[in-house]
Amino acid sequence: MEITQRIELLKNLTQLNATSGYEDEVAEFLIKTLSENEIPYQQDPLGNIIVQMGENPDRIALFAHMDEVGFGVRGIREDGMLKFAPIGGVTDNILFSTPVVVGNNRVSGIIGNIPKHLQEKKSEQETKIPDMMIDIGATSKKDAEKSVKIGDPIYWLSDFVRFGDGLIKAKALDDRVGVAVILSLLLTKQYSFTAVFTTREEIGIMGARMVMPVLAPKKAVVLEVTTCADLPGNQEPTTKMREGVALSVLDGASVSDTEWNQFIWAIATEKNIPIQKKLTTRGGNDAGAVSYVSGGVPTAVLSLPGRYIHSPVSVISETDFDSMYRLAELLIKKA
């Protein structure tokens, strides 16, 4: 599949809403696409989607998670404002004034709090989520309850934009990037491998924990998005944009298989596919579940460097996106 087609697929995926536990929109898109292309799939009770392509799919499995970080409605005030809680890891200080969509009714809202110029000095410290509210334009609790209920998921509202020198801005690039790469490979119908689209990664890799006991891949690759530190200032080294996909050594949930990592690094270098090492060990991903079941599966993590991840304006490079596809394609050929 050509890069322009993959970028269009990524655009379509990022415009879908799927916080952890509410992955239906992405799952339905995948199921519709797979069905239209006569690609068999399975879906387990937790919503994970498994595709086993070709005659020997257990050679290698590729993983990507469908969910994104977001929020849930935890209360409705008497004045019609919504109280909310995070779903996944979200930083409080990026939220004020961001537009959101609430629930299946797609109610528009804005995250707000007391304006800075009206706050007393004692309130000048960073505002936390419990002190914020979502304004949906309701005049009362009764008015708000006509379209919103406690427990409704809340999503960021953000356009997909190509800008600058080959950059992409969107919400949910973590991990619609991985989903787009794997789906693109499936649609070629050229390769034998297992594809796994997992749920609930952002709240403790729950989907991967459930799906792995029924799989038996000889090797695995988790496709992800990670932080990058390529802007001016004193930042912890992580990855750099436009320098290729990042290969993890270890993180907070797993240690990558050394021999598998060495193979990946060598073959990427041989084929002139840009690759770098991820220098930070923070965070975790589905590899934390994939590595340690079925007697142990040699697992590697390939991550795309992303600026401002877990926000409505995450940014990636088109060339890095292409590098991930090319390397994943090479691995399912050569593993």
Write out the residue ranges for each language-model feature.
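N-terminal hydrophobic/helix-forming segments and targeting peptides
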Residues: 1-335
